[in-house]
Amino acid sequence: MANDLLDNKGRGEAGWSWPAIHPEGRKYGLVVAAASLVTAFLAWETIAWPLAFLALGVLAFFRDPERIVPHDEKAIVSPADGMVSLISEVEPPPELAMADAAGNPGLGDAPLTRISIFMSVFDVHINRTPIAGQVSRLIYVPGKFLNADLDKASEENERQHLLVSRPDGLQIGFTQIAGLVARRIVPFVKQGDIVAVGQRIGLIRFGSRVDVYLPAGTAPAVIKGQKVVAGETVLARVGENRLLEGSAQ
């Protein structure tokens, strides 16, 4: 682990070393840092110091560490850093379930295993794709800003649905959900793009959640309460249906 912290290969704790900062964070950090310098120049120390710490916090929030992606075609990797807050059997949302206007199939309306990953404000908030393939669907839905850890947040909050499809027919749907503090989902990809497994596909600002829908016949390889790392932690392996103790909630 010590080497990971030094070379910043992204094995969970490596996120706390000093990785690259995403451009979204640089502009916010620069503004807050500039405000801190101005207030310090004016000798307003009671304001300058909090602003300086806030600038560091903004940069830490938007840190963007590299990740070691597993070379396993069956692997479905975590799209987000955070904690598995819920594993449940649910029907996919209509945006992912139904066929699109061109007749391309969705996930269907049969219940699938959904793994919900909650990202606190201390987690890396860059999201990554769970598999390689084509972004066959990307749908943004405006909504509320409830606590992202609540189950109903998946139906009522601002969210963005993505469907990644492989030539062999495998489709993985996942949803970025804005939270109580998060107020904007920022996409890095568009519909039709070809993506690699673990590729950066977007971010959600300041605390949020990502739901992943596993294909039928595939059991989760994680349990509720487990910490996961985007692009590295294997949530499941396609076709493997052995349930882990504690994975059924």
Curated annotation (Swiss-Prot):
SUBUNIT field: Heterodimer of a large membrane-associated beta subunit and a small pyruvoyl-containing alpha subunit.
EC assignment: 4.1.1.65
GO molecular function, one term: phosphatidylserine decarboxylase activity
Principal place of residence: membrane
GO BP of this protein: phosphatidylethanolamine biosynthetic process
Cited PANTHER family: ARCHAETIDYLSERINE DECARBOXYLASE PROENZYME-RELATED
Enzyme class: lyase
InterPro entries for this protein: PS_Dcarbxylase, PSD-A
Membrane topology: Peripheral membrane protein
Protein's organism: Erythrobacter litoralis (strain HTCC2594)
Lineage top rank: taxon: Bacteria
Family, as annotated: Belongs to the phosphatidylserine decarboxylase family. PSD-A subfamily.
Record PTM text: Is synthesized initially as an inactive proenzyme. Formation of the active enzyme involves a self-maturation process in which the active site pyruvoyl group is generated from an internal serine residue via an autocatalytic post-translational modification. Two non-identical subunits are generated from the proenzyme in this reaction, and the pyruvate is formed at the N-terminus of the alpha chain, which is derived from the carboxyl end of the proenzyme.
Claim: Lipid metabolism is one of the keywords in the record: yes
Alphabetized UniProt keyword annotations: Cell membrane, Decarboxylase, Lipid biosynthesis, Lipid metabolism, Lyase, Membrane, Phospholipid biosynthesis, Phospholipid metabolism, Pyruvate, Zymogen
Name the UniProt record assigns to this protein: Phosphatidylserine decarboxylase proenzyme
Compartments, as annotated in UniProt: Cell membrane
Site (described: Cleavage (non-hydrolytic)): 207-208
Catalytic activity as recorded in UniProt: a 1,2-diacyl-sn-glycero-3-phospho-L-serine + H(+) = a 1,2-diacyl-sn-glycero-3-phosphoethanolamine + CO2
Residue numbers bearing the Pyruvic acid (Ser) modification: 208
